[in-house]
């Protein structure tokens, strides 16, 4: 169950799962090539892709950009601990952080801190500015810890989809 609901992925057949795997590898693949790879003719393949989009399995298509070419080579993770004494502090923080383009990811986590943020900036000076002028001023922020990535060993957005 997902939030009290049935897990929709359990109803996917082998062909749907293969379609999703192929689209994760190459979102720009032509329908004709995709249909060959999954063993369907083009029309039913396209119908399945459109159904998977309608049902929310496919949320969109995007280009993977090289951050080192685009002045965003410093990858930083930030632990955020909130002052839990304020009412609605989590909701206020969530609303505020969603407006920040600099934040690529924000996750509410269990453990010794409340949120884990991911950001990319040009350099340490830019990060110091982001921290001092933006992150520390977010609603309810009590403490932060910064982790600067020295080397990206593995990075992937792909989900493991078992084809059974």
UniProtKB/Swiss-Prot annotation:
Where DNA binds (residue ranges)?
A: 31-50
Task: Recite the UniProt keywords alphabetically.
Answer: Activator, DNA-binding, Transcription, Transcription regulation
**Domain HTH asnC-type per the UniProt entry, residue ranges:** 12-73
Listed under GO biological process in this entry are: alanine catabolic process; regulation of DNA-templated transcription; response to L-leucine
Gene Ontology molecular function: sequence-specific DNA binding
Write down a Pfam family by its short name.
Answer: HTH_24
One GO term describing the cellular component = cytosol
Question: Keyword NAD, does the record have it?
Answer: no
InterPro entries attached here? Answer: ArsR-like_HTH, AsnC-type_HTH_dom, Dimeric_a/b-barrel, Tscrpt_reg_AsnC-like, Tscrpt_reg_AsnC/Lrp_C, Tscrpt_reg_HTH_AsnC-type_CS, WH-like_DNA-bd_sf, WH_DNA-bd_sf
Function comment: Mediates a global response to leucine. Exogenous leucine affects the expression of a number of different operons; lrp mediates this effect for at least some of these operons. For example it is regulator of the branched-chain amino acid transport genes.
- Subunit structure, per the record? Homodimer.
User: What protein name is recorded for this chain?
Assistant: Leucine-responsive regulatory protein
